[in-house]
Amino acid sequence: MSKMKLRKSLLIAALALAAVAALVYANRMYVLMYSLGWYTDIANPREANRPVPWQTGPAAPEQALAQRPPNIIVIMADDLGINDVSTHGGGHQAEGVPTPAIDSIARDGVRFDQGYAGSAVCTVSRAALMTGRYPWRFGVEFTPTPGSLARVAGSLYADPNRLYPAIIDQAKASQARDFSDLGMPASERTVAELLKGRGYHNIHIGKWHLGSTAEMRPNNQGFDESLFMESGLYLPEKDPRVVNSKQDFDPIDRFLWPNMRYGVSYNAGKWFEPSKYLTDYFTDEAVTAIQRNKHRPFFMYLAHWGVHTPLQASKADYDALANIPDHRRRVYAAMVRSVDRSVGRVLQALRDEGLDSNTIVIFTSDNGAPSYIGLPDLNKPYRGWKLTLFEGGLRVPYVAKWPGRIPAGTQYAAPVSNIDILPTVAAAAGASLPTDRVIDGVNLLPFLAPGGTAQPARSLYWRDGPYRTVQDQGWKLIVSERPKKDWLFNLGDDPTEQHNLASLQPQKLAQLKALLATHHAGMPPPLWPSFIEMPVLIDKTLDQPQAAGDELTYWAN
């Protein structure tokens, strides 16, 4: 090749590279937005669906059912608002979508009328449930967030029509540890580990969100088997069996759709695709696992992804709700319908296998419903949302049953939290609590038994950085740094938090601030920092116009 031709070829190549670089730069936000999904496709290719090789217990029982420790099933929904469930006085009943299966647990057992999540966000709440401890005792204070999100968050959250911007600390984000390393320390003792010491076979199905390294996965936290939700699609977006609803006004939704995938793994093996709509798939596998373990005591943690975004309903459920004219509400109601159907199928499997009489079933949600799906009544009558410390973010559906031990139709008025699940089921199973650490939850069984004692007064706490809450003897204090404000409510008189008494009750304000200071003194720093603070309007959904004077708080992640 002549020098002239070589120069010409190099020039063409350079121009082509420059054009590609210019194209990438011009579409850099698109590239960044889709990068996590592309990386997932390369790092974790999904294989075709295959049967889950659930372990099989004894062919015959070693003890009569009544002599065995009770089976224990904890079903946790994701982002399910208290007004989504008809036993709590809400539900989509006007639209023909009650929740009869969830309601039946309350009918046959107890409804907790002041049932609280351990946090207003998923990871922290799940850590509380697993350990019976306030998660900030061991540094879990924020939901793990990939540092790469900060690079696109500025664009995602940029909206000139919004008065209240998100606050992003790019310096902290640039120093963020690898996303997979963020989670609950393996040194924590989980409810599964306690039950394993009593001979339980422990099964995890669904969402975990407490870390994905080997040491933090369920199999290293006391679970014998784990069907692990690896990403976040209920079905592929174009699958004819699914109906989608996208919220273009929601930055989180715009991030999820290009980056979520449809995949699970079994016992930390290779990713593979489920066989159907995710809620139904997890339910199928839960029923199979119950059948395989009917002759030995088992603990099952069925952690549904429903009804978390992205909003995707099975087409069958969507078609069954043709009476709902609004597309988004119809998709959401169909998702609620699928979660309730799952509960019903699990209960039926227990009856079919003759296990119902000696199985504890608990149903709850990890936090209240979010504002960012644009449906205004999901937490009614309570104010606030997921990512707030108002009642709408913390008060959740919470029902339980244990035939013969918890009287049917019990309505329990005292405050309870999902930190109480570990000590309660440990007591039922005869397991001892750890003595080398503080357990914040309490065993509820003495208070639920026929003629049981009254629950002693106690304080409950929540925390997200400097945004903190204490509830004590019917009073609740919320303190915030952004905005710098205190809210003081008498929940006995004002359960929906309409009247801020902070300026009218200085002595009570000081008393509760002292409780907060005492509780948080000496707590360790978070294991990882937050680098995004998101504004959440207390009384508006994300798609509603913001106005001067709107009441809001900021949530750190």
Segments from the language model and where they lie:
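Active-site segment of extracytoplasmic enzymes that catalyze sulfate/phosphate-ester chemistry
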Residues: I82-R189, L194, F223-S226
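Histidine-centered active-site microenvironments of extracellular/periplasmic hydrolases
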Residues: A214-G222, T309-K315, I324, Q348-R405, ...
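A short beta-strand-to-alpha-helix junction
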Residues: H92-T99, Q114-V121, G147, R151, ...
